[in-house]
Amino acid sequence: MERHFEKVEEILKKYGYKRENLIKILLEIQEIYRYLPEDVINYVSTAMGIPPAKIYGVATFYAQFSLKPKGKYTIMVCDGTACHMAGSPEVLKAIEEETGLTPGNVTEDLMFSLDQVGCLGACALAPVMVINGEVYGNLTADKVKEILRKIKEKERESANV
């Protein structure tokens, strides 16, 4: 697939092609693509005069960057001790049953991606998952499936508008 770089170029211009703005630049690029594609990293490297290895170093050091496509809805399931004991394995199983996803993967339609993470800091609500920054706690398999079905329904409705 041939990619056009107009939006990337706008971001680079906005930040003056300055090295000290690399993290901001990468964050904005990731908002567009939902990850940092290799060809875009190479484009940024050439445009900014930064070796690709340096950009990959930044992209792999900071947890908020992804080199793999992410879904429109990024699901993070806590598997810290409290959540694990309270049922996070069942939460993961319910997500897999509803979406076909296993941790570290994305659905073919790029609707959902799933990450299994350490403590999310909401132990009192265990088991917990976060979808695009929204925390869902005290989960059961049925609650998880209901949440995901509502998201799917919302997406179907907005596609039909």
From Swiss-Prot:
One of its GO terms (molecular function) is oxidoreductase activity. SUPFAM superfamilies: Thioredoxin-like. Its EC number is 1.12.1.4. Its main location: cytoplasm. Changing G80P: Large decrease (149 mV) in the redox potential. Causes a change to a [4Fe-4S] cluster protein. It catalyses: 2 H2 + 2 oxidized [2Fe-2S]-[ferredoxin] + NAD(+) = 2 reduced [2Fe-2S]-[ferredoxin] + NADH + 3 H(+). Changing G121P: Decrease (22 mV) in the redox potential. Signal peptide: none annotated. Binds 1 [2Fe-2S] cluster. [2Fe-2S] cluster binds at C78, C83, C119, C123. Keywords: 2Fe-2S, Cytoplasm, Iron, Iron-sulfur, Metal-binding, NAD, Oxidoreductase. Its cofactor is [2Fe-2S] cluster. It is an enzyme of class 1 (oxidoreductase). Changing A122P: Large decrease (132 mV) in the redox potential. The keyword Nucleus does not apply. Changing T81P: Small increase (11 mV) in the redox potential. It is found in: Cytoplasm. The keyword Cell cycle does not apply. One of its GO terms (cellular component) is cytoplasm. Belongs to the complex I 24 kDa subunit family. Heterotrimer composed of HydA (alpha subunit), HydB (beta subunit) and HydC (gamma subunit). Near neutral and acidic pH conditions favor oligomerization of the heterotrimeric holoenzyme. Catalyzes the oxidation of the physiological electron carriers NADH and reduced ferredoxin, coupled to the production of H(2). Acts as a bifurcating [FeFe] hydrogenase, which uses the exergonic oxidation of reduced ferredoxin to drive the unfavorable oxidation of NADH to produce H(2). The gamma subunit might be the site where reduced ferredoxin is oxidized. NCBIfam families: PRK07539.1-2 (NF005722). This is Bifurcating [FeFe] hydrogenase gamma subunit. It comes from Thermotoga maritima (strain ATCC 43589 / DSM 3109 / JCM 10099 / NBRC 100826 / MSB8). The lineage of its organism: Bacteria, Thermotogati, Thermotogota, Thermotogae, Thermotogales. The gene is hydC.
